Design a protein with these regions (language model features):
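Active-site mouth loops of central-metabolism enzymes
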Residues: 75-86, 146-163
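Acidic, glycine-enriched loop/beta-strand segments at the rims
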Residues: 25-37, 51, 379-382, 397-402, ...
Length: 462
């Protein structure tokens, strides 16, 4: 941008310029500001005016924002493009249709996720911004090993330190935005992973390895946790005893698959740990997570869906119409086969998750909003709005939930200085809402327009 343009941003506007007039803006840091006009051009927010001082700008496309609310486009910070190949080509349009303009892919084969990311940057593509972790970095036996449709190939198996070092060397040479550590890693493998990641300045999120506890994982540099996974085992009164038991079970004398072995350990320890929670250890964990800035992406919508069988409700079944026909049929059949019986222990686990989210938030632990779509019958886009509702029900304020779906994922990825805020010079990834989400978080579903890279997305065609 020339100096003249910088001083007078309306002097060199392109034919793609848009002026959103008389709108209330919701910035995740500054909150609500009313009576504004927002000028967009060249994929950026060029100028924010007081409505009374906004120029006429003849020839510029105008959007009447009266009684509307403009906020940054949403993030889904936990998605998997490679989980269902029949869904992959439809995910971008569904994300945009429901106001998700950026996503974090949290695990899949490099050849798939890298191509998805590359395709998203092509000029002719209308796509969310896509940030990728590459494959789940797992131990042996790895969980997502293509053993069934429920366990497609999302991970790489590491049998020893040498394989970790070799695989990490290859991964950090790729165009990755972060890394994801998984549950079957040994402690030495995890430490080797973190050493290479730290040297490469790549943040690592993941599941606390079953061989470890939360405190050791964070001390070694873990910067994110997905699903609160295995936190409860680290804050039980008998946490040390549970860890010794896990190390014994991880010897895998029965030769179980990675998925079966992990499930057996969860079944043996998860509810026992919750029943014997040590409040002092939980406080110590919350304090450490806050001090080290370890982001939590709890994916409450996923676990709530499993626990309550919410996906069997008529309103949820009706939403399947937005999916490709093949996927809609497959999901409908799988939903029916799952039955309608509610498992009390699963309900109890979800209640613990929600209580823990509220507790961690009170202790200033940072959060991101993510869903795990398309796993668990979670429709891309729609499911993120349910996640926001559940975050608020768990104790986050409406603004904190908005932060979790905007600026916090940007901060995790180090892009917060140019996206996910309503500020001049920031990317014009925006959603225009008919209602105020600060009053009712469900208003994020009341989408009037979606703007991606400064262009209005034709969501009515999706």
């Amino acid at each position: 941008m020339t100096m003249f343009m910088a001083c007078n941003p309306t002097s060199q506007l392109t034919e793609e310029a848009i002026l959103i007039q008389n709108v209330s803006i919701i910035d995740p840091v500054n909150g609500l500001e009313q009576n504004k006009s927002v000028l967009i051009d060249r994929a950026k927010i060029v100028r924010i005016y007081e409505q009374s001082q906004a120029p006429e700008l003849s020839g510029v496309s105008k959007i009447d924002g009266t009684n509307n609310y403009l906020m940054p486009g949403l993030w889904d910070a936990h998605v998997h493009y490679s989980f269902d190949e029949n869904m992959r080509s439809e995910m971008n349009s569904l994300f945009l249709k429901y106001g998700i303009t950026s996503v974090r892919d949290t695990g899949g084969p490099m050849d798939i996720v890298l191509q998805v990311k590359i395709a998203s940057t092509r000029a002719e593509e209308i796509s969310p911004s896509i940030y990728i972790a590459g494959p789940l970095i797992d131990g042996s036996p790895n969980v997502y090993n293509n053993s069934s449709p429920y366990y497609p190939l999302l991970s790489i198996e590491n049998t020893d330190i040498q394989s970790i070092e070799e695989n990490m060397g290859a991964l950090v040479a790729e165009d990755l935005d972060f890394l994801k550590a998984y549950e079957m890693l040994t402690e030495p493998q995890f430490k080797a992973l973190m050493k290479t990641a730290n040297e490469s300045e790549l943040r690592v999120t993941g599941h606390i390895p079953l061989s470890m506890n939360l405190f050791s994982a964070v001390d070694n540099g873990l910067k994110g946790m997905e699903h609160l996974r295995n936190l409860e085992m680290s804050v039980a009164q008998n946490a040390d005893e549970l860890q010794e038991q896990r190390l014994e079970m991880l010897q895998n004398q029965e030769g179980l698959s990675g998925g079966a072995l992990r499930s057996s350990i969860h079944a043996a320890q998860r509810m026992e740990a919750i029943a014997q929670l040590d409040s002092s250890k939980l406080l110590a964990a919350a304090t450490l997570l806050a001090e080290e800035g370890v982001w939590q992406t709890p994916t409450l919508a996923l676990y709530n869906n499993f626990a309550t069988k919410e996906y069997l409700e008529d309103s949820a079944v009706e939403k399947l119409r937005v999916l490709p026909a093949e996927v809609s049929i497959a999901w409908s059949e799988a939903m029916k086969m799952s039955g309608s019986e509610i498992d009390p222990s699963t309900i109890a686990y979800v209640e613990w998750m929600r209580e823990t989210v509220g507790y961690l938030n009170q202790n200033e632990v940072p959060f991101m909003a993510g869903t795990d779509t398309p796993i668990g019958f979670l429709i891309p886009g729609i499911s993120l709005h349910r996640e926001l509702e559940l975050l608020v029900q768990s104790g986050l304020s409406n603004l904190e939930a908005i932060e979790a779906a905007t600026i916090e994922p940007a901060r995790f990825l180090g892009v917060e200085r140019h996206t996910s805020r309503i500020l001049e010079g920031y990317e014009a990834d925006l959603i225009l809402l008919r209602e105020n989400p600060l009053e009712n978080i469900s208003a994020t579903k009341e989408i009037e327009k979606v703007i991606k890279s400064g262009k209005v997305v034709p969501i009515e065609e999706f």
